[in-house]
Swiss-Prot record:
Function: One of two assembly initiator proteins, it binds directly to the 5'-end of the 23S rRNA, where it nucleates assembly of the 50S subunit.
Gene3D superfamilies named in the record: 2.30.30.30
Pfam families: KOW (PF00467), ribosomal_L24 (PF17136)
UniProt name for this protein: Large ribosomal subunit protein uL24
GO cellular component: ribonucleoprotein complex; ribosome
Protein family according to the UniProt entry: Belongs to the universal ribosomal protein uL24 family.
SMART domains: KOW
Record-linked InterPro entries: KOW, Rib_uL2_dom2, Ribosomal_uL24, Ribosomal_uL24_CS, Ribosomal_uL24_KOW, Translation_prot_SH3-like_sf
Biological-process GO terms, alphabetical: translation
PANTHER family xrefs: MITOCHONDRIAL RIBOSOMAL PROTEIN L24
Disulfide bond positions: none
Disordered, as annotated region: 52-78
Any GO molecular function: rRNA binding
Amino acid sequence: MANVKFKVKKGDTVKIIAGDDKGKTGKILAVLAKKGQVIVEGCKVAKKAIKPSEKTPNGGHVNKEMPIDISNVAKVEG
């Protein structure tokens, strides 16, 4: 996907047009240009396990947004 120009960028509001979160809207947190994916706030949330560390001595779980293919989002005007 090198040298491909995308119509969305970080901070844009987009609507999910395909997949489990179809119809939801959110702000783009990151664009993964090499993979052709975006991370949208509040969409495709997965629970990830965290290993114990100095920051989190007990470890645990955290909800994290996962990447969505850029073809599955549409920019919302406004």
